[in-house]
Amino acid sequence: MKRLLGLAVSAIALAACDSTAPDTSMQETDTAHMEPASSATERTAGYSEDRNAYFGDLHIHTRSSFDAYIFNVRRTANDAYRFARGETITHPSGFDMTIAGGPLDFYTVTDHAEYLGILPVMNTPGTELSKLPRAQDMFSTDPEKITAAFQSVGASVRSGEVIEEMYDESIIGSVWEQNIDAANRHYVPGEFTTFAAYEFTSVTVNEEEDSFAGGNLHRNVFFKGDAPDRAFSTLDSPNPEDLWDWMDEQRSEGYEAIAIPHNSNVSDGQMFRLETYNGDPLDVAYAEQRMRNEPLVEVTQVKGTSETHPSLSPNDEWANFEIYDRLLASYQVSKTEGGYVREAYRNGLKLQEEEGFDPFRFGLVAASDSHVVGGAYDESDYWSKVGVVDGTPMARGSVPFFGKKNWDEQPDNQMVNNAREWFSRWAASGLTGVWAEENTRESIFDAFRRKETFATTGPRMKVRFFAGYQYSDDMLDDADLTRQAYDGGVPMGGDLVGTGEAPTFLAWAQRDPNMGALQRVQVVKVTSVGEAVYDVACHTGSPDPATHRCSDNGAAVDMETCAPTGAGANELKAVWQDPEFDVAQRATYYVRVLENPSCRWSTWEAMRGNVPPRPDVPQTIQERAYTSPIWYIPAD
């Protein structure tokens, strides 16, 4: 945190974006209280029993988050929803942001509940909070005072110990109501869906380092319709299990909600640990409560991808993708075990077999975690996430510092080190896809509940995955393929109960027409004792039956222009059977779709800056999508 604040102060000074200037703006320009749109009594336009693919971002911050406002973010929840619907918004560094690929179908502001909306009031002349010595230090021109004041807020969020003088429940409650109102105001059933939501900001403090570095245990909490008058935060308790208790209580009072954990990759191995928050053994009650409240997990976002890690999946050639492993506000490396979803699936199956419960039956989603109200989903149009801290190519380390034209002699200072350790390693990711009957809160939330969701690293590729016992290759070209798939099996997120015979799987993917062509579709199989990756559909034809791999389709990138070379597929589909299926063994299956190679955002920025790409990050990537799994359950 100290490093980040020091860099912020320098960036603010360099950009002449003075975050210490008094805040005279209104928190919201639209202040009329809005009730949520009533549940539709008639189906909206576009309703489909076979379900439509809708895309959205479930993790967005505004000026009301303490770690956005300090970095000169001044945009509101209303601005966030306008951005998602296609309006151009100004970045804190002064340039325009317009969403790549056109308007999204759904969007959610998830400001940190801790000290929600407090910093803007501390920086508003004449308020009681502005008179506090802590406020005067935080918005002074003294870097040491700014850093110390903001660190104290971070320490409070991590410990759960309230700073009484700045904890004004009336302000926090008012801003929470404003965020709810903004979600209600911009919700248009059938066109654009929003949810009242917030972030629960739990962090495990790393005792080995004298800083605020720690493991990320954050959750975003979403309400299906109405939301309660207050949000449960780490200032109530940093223990996620206490959050689940509160959610159960709210559900009994009519407030249906789910929580979605994110960035398990930097949880220091704590997100999927094999014991409770307080170190007790896991049990059936824990598993049931976790799955009731956390049916999904955010698998990819700007701070990296949490599917798997090369050390956990050494035989997966595509495991080393956008790996980010630095603890929050630290250069220290997060522990790998306990931090990745595929390993959690394996451990969950083992617990099911040995203990009779599985607390890790998550569906998959993705988001940006943007703190500037709008996500950067396109590698060729990237603006990172924090604000003025990483608002330029130099600040995020994609071009050499201070006008140099090569990477040989970079200065040894905090800005350079932060760019190397953090910002250059971040990713232009991601988006959630859902299969829902219509674009409404009820339909999309129900898709969350049944885990008929998929995650992408930014492109809006559509992916379906089914399992059953009646699928055949003859179905693939039928006009009613989707209806047959639903009628003959279960979709992603479902359980397939054994019948004594081997199931068949149906995988289908369609490219985003504005992004790269498809290279392959894979099925990832996980059991309690191992894993395997099978190519099941290839641009080049059928996979090799011995290696289960597609042949090379020759796709590449022209590194002078970032233009793709070679061909790829617009659509890939296959009916597949597991060649090593064991009728008696539980297994988890999910689909991973890979695009052809494309330039990473850092390469795009280096090309525009007429400098060589940064040598310590990949020059190209393969954008991808991940479906929620299907769980095979042997017959009794």
Locate the predicted segments by residue.
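Sec-dependent signal peptide recognition
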Residues: 2-8
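C-terminal motif of bacterial Sec signal peptides marking the signal peptidase cleavage site
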Residues: 14-16
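C-terminal functional module detector
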Residues: 18-77, 81-84, 88-136, 168, ...
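The substrate-binding groove and active-site-proximal loops of carbohydrate-active enzymes
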Residues: 66-71, 160-173, 224-237, 329-339
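Low-complexity, serine/threonine/proline-enriched polar segments
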Residues: 134-158
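A conserved hydrophobic secondary-structure block that centers on an alpha-helix together
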Residues: 166-170, 185-189, 201-211, 215-217, ...
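Alpha-helix-centered segments that form part of catalytic cores
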Residues: 172-180
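Hydrophobic, small-residue-rich alpha-helical packing segments that form membrane-like cores
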Residues: 209-215, 220-222, 226-228, 235-282
